UniProtKB/Swiss-Prot annotation:
Residues 45-56 have a biased composition (Pro residues). It comes from Arabidopsis thaliana. Belongs to the transferase hexapeptide repeat family. NCBIfam families: cysE, EPS_EpsC. The lineage of its organism: Eukaryota, Viridiplantae, Streptophyta, Embryophyta, Tracheophyta. This is Serine acetyltransferase 3, mitochondrial.
Length: 391
């Protein structure tokens, strides 16, 4: 039994602890239980024995032949189990292998070890953004409030993106709080969109030498932000919430000078470099790992309805000032030179240049390339073969 004076001082100390610690649940904080826990001698029990390891055959079967079925909302809990599959599904390269359950098919891929390293990089993007934000604050204290509100105080990548887009797309009659709730709901209910956001961040960081950090892209690259706003608008469009989808399209056009119809389908690993005056029509389809420069139009040829816009394959590079018009196909790994007007199909891994665009090497025997232009960003190597014009 404690003396009265000691009990009084002990009680006051507990009161000060409660009042200075907002994380303590005051309703469940009982003095008798706290005191007894402090002065009672507990008997140590031996640690439980670990469970026996599973049989080797079961382990192999679990790792190589089965893909767990999980709900989208629980995907973060099983991230390690899913990482080897998601990257294959969302970030396709020519010359890589894609694993689909017990089935293997050739899609031309990179080595598996590099895939796993890249998976880890995708998963760590949000942590890296936060680290970079704190580093920038230390270097430039003037950005402290902006970075704290945009990045440091946000609990997740989804919340930070919803906050950034809602601030940039709001106006007097469309408050940011309303947009934040809308964007957050879409992002939290669609982990595929969040995965695409991460892959787009990696694409910009890898392919654009002007991008100095992930946080730089996340806050300041309007091509990246316009693409993520389109992903949200497209999800609303598929839910038949077309009024909201078109409203977002309008605000993106006004704020970023980028005009994507919400019906257009956009892949992952997308780079919109500079992005000003990019126009993509309603029935256009853009594949994975595509790089598009500014002042590019993927449009129709008139006022006809139906499927009327271009289909862009994986790994395509589209140079600045290009117009690709009509329901035509730009093959996988093709390159479209700057200033071209493309009105006909372009075969895979070829280069089309000019107005009207012509294939490098001619229609009958076009020259092909092995590298992926959408990743290498090589915009000028074709010029010496296409023309002998020299300044």
């Amino acid at each position: 039994m404690l003396p009265v004076t000691s009990r009084r001082h002990f009680t006051m100390s507990l009161y000060m602890l409660r009042s200075s610690s907002p994380h303590i649940n005051h309703h469940s904080f009982l003095l008798p239980s706290f005191v007894s826990s402090k002065f009672k001698h507990h008997t140590l029990s031996p640690p439980p024995s670990p469970p026996p390891p599973p049989p080797m055959a079961a382990c192999i079967d679990t790792c190589r032949t089965g893909k767990p079925q999980i709900s989208p909302r629980d995907s973060s809990k099983h991230h390690d189990d899913e990482s080897g599959f998601r990257y294959m599904n969302y970030f396709r390269y020519p010359d890589r292998s894609s694993f689909n359950g017990t089935q293997t098919k050739t899609l031309h891929t990179r080595p598996l070890l590099e895939d796993l390293d890249r998976d880890a990089e995708v998963d760590d993007v949000w942590a890296k953004i936060r680290e970079e934000a704190k580093s920038d604050i230390a270097k430039e204290p003037i950005v402290s409030a902006y970075y704290h509100a945009s990045i440091v105080s946000q609990r997740s990548l989804e919340a930070a993106l919803a906050n950034t887009l809602s601030v940039k797309l709001s106006n007097l009659n469309l408050p940011s709080n309303t947009l934040f709730d809308l964007f957050s709901g879409v992002l939290q209910g669609n982990p595929d969109i969040v995965e695409s956001v991460k892959l787009d961040l990696l694409a910009v960081k890898e392919r654009d030498p002007a991008c100095i950090s992930y946080v730089h892209c996340f806050l300041h690259f309007k091509g990246f932000l316009a693409c993520q706003a389109h992903r949200i608008a497209h999800e609303l469009w598929t839910q038949d919430r077309k009024i909201l989808a078109l409203l977002i399209q309008n605000r993106v056009s006004e704020a970023f000078a980028v005009d994507f119809h919400p019906g257009a389908k956009i892949g992952t690993g997308i780079l919109l470099d500079h992005a000003t005056a990019i126009v993509i029509g309603e029935t256009a389809v853009v594949g994975n790992n595509v790089s598009i420069l500014h002042n590019v139009t993927l449009g129709g040829t008139g006022k006809q309805c139906g499927d009327r816009h271009p289909k862009i394959g994986d790994g395509v590079l589209i140079g600045a000032g290009t117009c690709i018009l009509g329901n035509i196909t730009i093959g996988e790994g093709a390159k479209i030179g700057a200033g071209s007007v493309v009105l006909k199909d372009v075969p895979p891994r070829t280069t089309a240049v000019g107005n009207p665009a012509r294939l490098l090497g001619g229609k009958d025997n076009p020259k092909t390339h092995d590298k992926i232009p959408g990743l290498t960003m090589d915009q000028t190597s074709h010029i010496s073969e296409w023309s002998d014009y020299v300044i």
